[in-house]
Design a protein with these regions (language model features):
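C-terminal helical subdomain
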Residues: 177, 201-233, 237, 244-246
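Short, small/polar-rich loop/turn modules that mediate ligand/substrate recognition or access, typified
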Residues: 83, 169, 174, 237-239
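Alpha-helical segment proximal to the catalytic Tyr-Lys
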Residues: 122, 166-170, 235
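Short C-terminal tail/terminal secondary-structure segment
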Residues: 3, 142, 227, 238-251
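Residue(s) in the substrate-gating loop at a strand-loop-helix junction
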Residues: 137
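Substrate-binding pocket helix/loop in short-chain dehydrogenase/reductase
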Residues: 93-94, 101-106, 193, 207
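Active-site helix of classical SDR
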Residues: 117, 153, 161
């Protein structure tokens, strides 16, 4: 157990998948959690599960994000942890990638991460404490085939993480990234496998064979690392991009 009682976290994209798992894990460790999602019903559902605070906002809209940060501060008076989890992906050959899909990935994955960080960090600076956790990806380190746009967006997240870590260290704020490998949950597995079949890509069961641990990740694997980065157990860590791929990526 991590000592997160009395702390406040804001999780973007908290209405499902990895974001939901992170919100549940943090709440289970005693943290008060604001669940931000552009899907109002999803945010409210997760908030109800954990006794948290639901916020409806689109991370690509600065005014909405500013209001979300203000609402969180109005409710809890502080933000100790920011988890930039909101993201979108598209899988397929680079030359088949719709321009709209590329733009969406860049807009949400990197611009959204920047916009939310810019809204929250001044409050952390004022208190001279805080932790920011960005969701990157193993694809942000290796550039795997069939993930060109997604990979580009996650390389950018890692770069942003390192730059912010250097700028924020003197203010007592740590900034780190988690780089999951292949994460699959029940809700998304069917959609992923449909795309794999469409382009003749290796199916999930086949890809598992390339993972030394022998399975794909589940959202709670990521949530456990997020809780660690929220805690004082990681007090000497900043600017890190933590591989969480079951050995798929080793560096």
């Amino acid at each position: 157990m991590y000592a997160l009682n009395g702390r406040v976290g804001l999780v973007t994209g908290g209405g499902g998948g990895i974001g939901r798992a992170i919100a549940l894990r943090l709440a289970g460790e005693g943290m008060a959690v604001a669940v931000l999602d552009r899907d109002s019903s999803a945010a409210q559902s997760v908030a109800a599960e954990i006794g948290g605070f639901a916020i409806t906002a689109d991370v690509t809209e600065p005014e909405q994000v500013d209001r979300a940060a203000d609402a969180t501060l109005g409710r809890f008076e502080k933000i100790d942890l920011l988890v930039n989890n909101a993201g979108v992906a598209w899988m397929g050959p680079a030359l088949d990638t719709p321009l709209e899909a590329l733009q969406a990935m860049l807009r949400v994955n990197i611009e959204g991460t920047f916009i939310v960080s810019r809204a929250v960090l001044p409050h952390m600076i004022a208190r001279r404490t805080g932790s920011v956790v960005n969701l990157a990806s193993w694809a942000g380190k290796t550039g795997p085939a069939f993930f060109a746009g997604y990979s580009a967006s996650k390389f950018a997240v890692i770069g942003l993480t390192q730059a912010l870590a250097r700028e924020m260290a003197s203010h007592g704020i740590r900034v780190n990234a988690i780089c999951p490998g292949i994460v699959v949950d029940t809700a998304m597995r069917a959609a992923i496998e449909a795309q794999q079949r469409r382009y003749g890509l290796p199916e999930t069961a086949e890809r598992e064979k390339s993972i030394p641990i022998g399975r794909v990740s589940i959202p709670d694997d990521v949530a456990r690392v997020a809780a660690f980065l929220a805690s004082e157990e990681s007090a000497y860590m900043t600017g890190e991009s933590i591989n969480l791929s079951g050995g798929l990526l080793m560096d």
